[in-house]
C-alpha cells in the first residue's frame, strides 16, 4: 500500500488533498431495528491485519513527509437489511471480499431470532467509518 500512496503522491497536483475513507478496525455489530434506533445482539469476528497494515502505510508516508495529516473524523455507518436472505447475501459478499472466517454461527442465530420471524424488524449491521484528509507536501 505504501507504493500506491506514493503513486497517489506522484499524480496529485501540488498541495493536493488525499481522502482516506475506510471502515474502522473494530468488529461490526449486528442487531435489529427497535423504535428509532436498534438493539445490539451480536458482534462479528473479523480479522484486522489488512486494516492495521493500511494504517501503518498511511503513517509511513506521513512520517516520510509525503503527506501531512490535516483531519480525521469517525462516524457511524448502518447497513439495514429487511430480510434474512438480504443479510445472508451481504454477509457472503463481505466474507468473500475480506477473506474472513465463516460466520455461519451468526446466520443461524439471526435466523432463529424472534425479530426475524415476526417480520416487524430489520437487521442492522453497524460499524464506524474513519475519514482522514492528507495534504500533499513538498
Describe each model-derived feature in a short phrase.
Residues 8, 20-22, 81:
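Long, contiguous hydrophobic alpha-helical segments, chiefly transmembrane helices and signal peptides
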Residues 2-17:
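A short glycine-rich, Lys/Arg-flanked "PGG" loop and its adjoining helix->strand segment in the class I
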Residues 17-49:
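Conserved class I S-adenosyl-L-methionine
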Residues 43-72:
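Active-site capping/gating segments
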Residues 63-138:
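Conserved Class I S-adenosyl-L-methionine
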Residues 24-31, 52-61, 105-112:
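Low-complexity, flexible helical/coil segments
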Residues 13, 21, 32, 49-58, ...:
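Conserved short hydrophobic patches within well-ordered secondary structure
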Amino acid at each position: 500500500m505504501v507504493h500506491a500512496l506514493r503513486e497517489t503522491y506522484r499524480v496529485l497536483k501540488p498541495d493536493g488533498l488525499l481522502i482516506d475513507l475506510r471502515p474502522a478496525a473494530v468488529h461490526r455489530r449486528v442487531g435489529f431495528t427497535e423504535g428509532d434506533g436498534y438493539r445490539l445482539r451480536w458482534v462479528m469476528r473479523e480479522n484486522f491485519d489488512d486494516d492495521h497494515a493500511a494504517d501503518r502505510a498511511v503513517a509511513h508516508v506521513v512520517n516520510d513527509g509525503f503527506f501531512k495529516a490535516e483531519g480525521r473524523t469517525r462516524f457511524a455507518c448502518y447497513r439495514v437489511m429487511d430480510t434474512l436472505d438480504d443479510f445472508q447475501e451481504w454477509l457472503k459478499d463481505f466474507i468473500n471480499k475480506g477473506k474472513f472466517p465463516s460466520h455461519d454461527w451468526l446466520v443461524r442465530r439471526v435466523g432463529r431470532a424472534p425479530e426475524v420471524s415476526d417480520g416487524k424488524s430489520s437487521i442492522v449491521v453497524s460499524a464506524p467509518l474513519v475519514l482522514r484528509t492528507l495534504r500533499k507536501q513538498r
